[in-house]
Swiss-Prot record:
GO cellular component: ribonucleoprotein complex; ribosome
Keyword rRNA-binding: yes
Pfam family, one: Ribosomal_L5_C
Species of provenance: Aeropyrum pernix (strain ATCC 700893 / DSM 11879 / JCM 9820 / NBRC 100138 / K1)
Quaternary state and interactors: Part of the 50S ribosomal subunit; contacts the 5S rRNA and probably tRNA. Forms a bridge to the 30S subunit in the 70S ribosome.
Name of the molecule in the record: Large ribosomal subunit protein uL5
Any one biological process term the GO annotation gives: translation
Amino acid sequence: MSAKAQSLPIPPERVSEILDEWKRSPMRRPRIVKVTVNISIGQSGERLQRAAEVLEELTGQKPVFRKAKRTIRAFGVRKGENIAVMVTLRGEKALNFLKRALDAVGHRIKTSSIDEHGNVSFGIEEHILIPGVKYDPRVGILGMDVAITIQRPGHRIVERRRQRRGHIPRRHRVTREETMVLLNQLFGVTFV
């Protein structure tokens, strides 16, 4: 067992069980399906446009504007007003961005950031922490949320059957432990 695997909050026996299972049947090995990056400003206007420029520069993909679901008078937000920008990355772009984003957080993620389906979310407090990004005074400092969606091969098949509502069995869902092992293997992530 590698030194990386010893830094996980999982018993080493369980880690080796998971790795053996993935070796025996490669279709059980989870994979990163997509990475969603979100910058929420809370207001429309010039600041949101600059956030969109920053997100496009970071990801190499054009962001989508997200609208407010309801009016919140205390914050001066109207229903339907653009308040955030987001990008969904897949494939090689997702992995490349994820490497840089994990560098920004020091390859450390809280265990509580993993949901019951094995997906992971974490925040980056300042976008200038991402390697290769320089501070621009006209933009300021922006925080962002990064969500990693992890699934096993075959998960998409059940989701695309619109006529016959599919059910994904519990045994086919990705567990927290598997997510920890996968991210530790791919990126050297430590869970605290």
